[in-house]
Amino acid sequence: MKEKIKLLKYLFFFSIFFLFLLYILPGELIEFNKEAVKNRTVFQGSIKHFYYFSYLTSLGLFVYLKEKNYLKIVFLLFLLSAFVEVIHLYVPGREFSYYDILANVLGYLFGFLLITLVKKYIKKD
């Protein structure tokens, strides 16, 4: 079991690294279909933020919730959410968006709620 947790920890930190890479790359390198990007709604752009932060929060809390320092993970993800949006101000082809921050926070809260409910359910069994 410890090996699985260790592997999940590596996956968690790799996912953060991957997210950071996506945010620092110019938009032209990421978006292959430029016409689809132009016609994208705010919801279509921000939903990816919701999914990714739900995933990151769920994975991080699942791995670290048994440890007493899980609040550090919560704080790290909150800072990461704000930091990656601020980076958009300086990366060519990227834009700062309050909707993306909202989607990050909602994804973060959803992941937190999901893991909290799963942990309560597991404790009952």
Which residues make up each language-model segment?
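Bulky hydrophobic segments
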Residues: 1-101, 105-125
